[in-house]
Regions:
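N-terminal targeting leaders characterized by basic, low-complexity, disordered sequences
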Residues: 1-37
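Substrate-binding cleft of extracellular glycoside hydrolase catalytic domains
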Residues: 94-121, 130-219, 227-229
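Catalytic domains of cell-wall/extracellular-matrix polysaccharide-remodeling enzymes
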Residues: 198-270
Length: 309
């Protein structure tokens, strides 16, 4: 009997405890649970915001890095084509557009001489690729041989600076003539300033009255004189095959400007090149004649590394 009473009392105590717990304890547990859930939601929102900020900054970075390619793509595929009186054969047009597309994040320039008339050039409108790429540098023929001077050089030299182009001057080398006289002709004609491109030696012909060793020796004389005058190694301009066959073993230390008009993605797969003249039939907005168009294999900051201090 007493055992039954004890069981009854224990049951009543447990029942009373359960009633107390049901009234008071769930509220505290629920509040704690709600706080935990709320904290988790806040943490989740914070993580989402962090991910959003990272994604947003990444998109800005990618957009900035690829802005030139985006502008080029839009201009070539969605923008109405700018009118120009000049035309190229379809194959040449496609080749030029493909190269420009590959290097659309690089720096483009032109080279001109007295063959381009003054009245044919609008210096304020020099662009390519349907207006999406500005011409940023220009190479001007200054001298030829021991006494030749380009008749438009002085005017083009001043005008290119006024229009904030990085300007460069080149000497057309005549292998039959004395290299010292040729170097002096260039130095007397061209007064390079800070921000101008290094002097450029244009080599296109081999001599008939000299050996190749004598020819290379003469070139080194010109380069040495001009380098001593400006304190920087001149840039060598020549054709791909000419460089490969006659120059590459002796002039590897000089910045290289290659001309190659073939249907290729690079002017040379072996030589380390800085500039590529990829067409002599370039159609440039602002010029009414076809011109040589070049690409520098780098950005503006790197191009300025090839200018005089």
């Amino acid at each position: 009997m007493f055992l039954g009473i004890n069981h009854y009392l224990d049951f009543q105590k447990q029942k009373a405890f359960n009633s107390f717990a049901a009234e008071f304890m769930p509220k505290k547990a629920t509040q704690k649970r709600r706080k935990t859930i709320a904290k988790k939601r806040i943490d989740a929102r914070k993580k989402l915001w962090v991910l959003f900020v990272i994604l947003f900054l990444s998109l800005i970075g990618i957009g900035f890095y690829m802005k030139d390619q985006v502008i080029f793509y839009y201009a070539m595929h969605f923008k109405g084509k700018e009118k120009h009186s000049l035309r190229n054969p379809k194959t040449e047009e496609e080749r030029i557009n493909r190269i420009v597309s590959i290097y659309s994040d690089k720096v483009f320039g032109i080279d001109i001489s007295h063959y381009q008339r003054k009245e044919d050039i609008n210096w304020k409108k020099l662009t390519i690729a349907n207006g999406s790429i500005d011409i940023r540098f220009i190479l001007l023929r200054a001298t030829m041989g021991k006494d030749g001077k380009d008749q438009h050089f002085d005017e083009y030299w001043k005008t290119s600076q006024k229009n904030e182009l990085i300007r460069g001057a080149y000497h057309f080398y005549r292998p039959k003539e004395d290299p010292v006289q040729q170097a002096n002709n260039f130095l007397e004609t061209v007064k390079l300033e800070s921000g101008d491109m290094r002097p450029v030696l244009d080599i296109e012909k081999i001599p008939r009255n000299k050996s190749l060793d004598e020819f290379r020796s003469d070139l080194k004389v010109w380069l040495k004189i001009v380098e001593e005058a400006y304190g920087e190694k001149p840039i060598i301009y020549t054709y791909y095959y000419f460089y490969r066959d006659y120059l590459q073993d002796d002039f590897k230390d000089y910045p290289l400007w290659l001309a190659n008009y073939n249907d290729v993605d690079v002017p040379s797969d072996k030589a380390e090149w800085r500039f590529w003249q990829f067409t002599e039939k370039g159609i440039v907005n602002g010029i009414n004649t076809k011109v040589d168009v070049n690409v520098f294999n780098g950005n503006m900051w790197q191009l300025k590394g090839l200018t005089l201090d």
